[in-house]
């Protein structure tokens, strides 16, 4: 974890002691269709996941809350002791959350607990995927532990201990049956490493050295793509062949990246932001930059979202920024009056969770 992210975490810890959670309450502006917006009060949100009609937010009081993405109404609420700030993962049937030293799978329809699996320490990010017709949860810890869990039972299928810490979200591709994870090298090393492995067995397909200022990886269109830099303004966005690890293309970027930034990928586009706030969208088929936009705000921890016509990020300064996908032009800057901890899109709505606000809430607004 970089010094900036450690400082940000420390500030949040200091502040939380003086904040009282708000009770759930939903407000709507009365409009319908595409223009309908809503705001639902929640107590001190940690993280947010959005998938289809479901918005899942982890909050204080050791709870996970599911809301309807169209109306904002609460669908269910589940108790999960020591739930973390890592983003909930959703698929058609499951909500996966990390909680202290374990992962917990909840039924997406009801919030009922399906299983929990101990991972020993500092549960981090996870992803729900499949091996053939079998659902699995690929999970990680901050101390470099990686495991594949049976999606139905939580039983470990395989596990591996990497020789370094994991701060970036893992990624997986069910079609290719592979996963990828980025980890930091030992204390005396100045590089990170990227490992691509077989989802069914954990067998290593290939590994590559990556510059220390790297984003999380994303698997898209037969490649593993991430941003990497040396911390001294030598940086790039690079794609490596999923099967072999051979470099397919790279494009320059003006600054290095943070492991808390997860690139967005859809269609023929991949988009990522460096830590000084320059967003780069790459045409993956041509291996060329389509546009770069400097929003001039630090970006240390965000999932980059790609909607049909928009790119969405959240900044370290507490803004949610929307850009036109085709041109890179900034079309909207949302100041939620607090700190956004997660963003998502659904049914042409931009959805975000905000804390340090009056009130702390999950809110939906129309996409530009």
Which positions does each model-derived feature cover?
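Secretory-pathway ectodomains
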Residues: 2, 10, 18-368
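A motif-centric signal for short, conserved binding hotspots located
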Residues: 7
């Amino acid at each position: 974890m970089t010094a900036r992210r450690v400082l940000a975490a420390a500030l949040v810890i200091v502040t939380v002691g003086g904040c009282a959670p708000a009770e759930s309450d939903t407000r709507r502006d009365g409009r319908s269709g595409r223009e309908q917006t809503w705001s639902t009060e929640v107590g001190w949100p940690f993280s947010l996941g959005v998938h289809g009609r479901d918005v899942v937010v982890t909050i204080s009081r050791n709870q996970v809350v599911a809301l309807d993405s169209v109306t904002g109404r609460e669908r269910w609420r589940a108790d999960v002791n020591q739930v973390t700030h890592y983003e909930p993962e959703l698929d058609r049937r499951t909500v996966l959350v990390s909680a202290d030293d374990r992962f917990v799978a909840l039924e997406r329809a009801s919030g009922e607990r399906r299983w929990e699996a101990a991972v020993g320490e500092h549960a981090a990010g996870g992803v729900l995927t499949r091996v053939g017709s079998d659902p699995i949860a690929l999970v990680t810890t901050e101390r470099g532990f990686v495991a594949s869990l049976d999606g139905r039972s939580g039983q470990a299928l395989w596990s591996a201990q990497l020789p370094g810490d994991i701060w970036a979200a893992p990624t997986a591709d069910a079609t290719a049956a592979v996963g990828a994870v980025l980890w930091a090298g030992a204390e005396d090393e100045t590089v990170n490493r990227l490992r691509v492995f077989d989802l069914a067995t954990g067998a290593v397909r290939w590994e590559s050295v990556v510059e220390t200022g790297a984003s999380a990886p994303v698997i898209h269109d037969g490649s593993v793509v991430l941003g990497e830099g040396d911390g001294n303004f030598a940086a790039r966005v690079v794609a490596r062949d999923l099967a072999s690890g051979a470099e397919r293309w790279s494009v320059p970027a003006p600054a290095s990246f943070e492991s808390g930034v997860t690139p967005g990928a859809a269609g023929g586009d991949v988009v990522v932001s460096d830590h000084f706030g320059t967003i780069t969208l790459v045409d993956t088929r041509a291996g060329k930059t389509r546009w770069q936009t400097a929003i001039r705000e630090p970006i240390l921890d965000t999932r980059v979202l790609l909607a049909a016509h928009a790119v969405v990020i959240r900044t370290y300064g507490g803004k949610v920024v929307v850009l036109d996908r085709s041109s890179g032009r900034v079309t909207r800057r949302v100041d939620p009056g607090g700190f956004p901890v997660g963003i998502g899109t659904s049914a042409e709505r931009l959805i975000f969770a905000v804390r340090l606000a009056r009130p702390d809430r999950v809110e939906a607004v129309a996409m530009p």
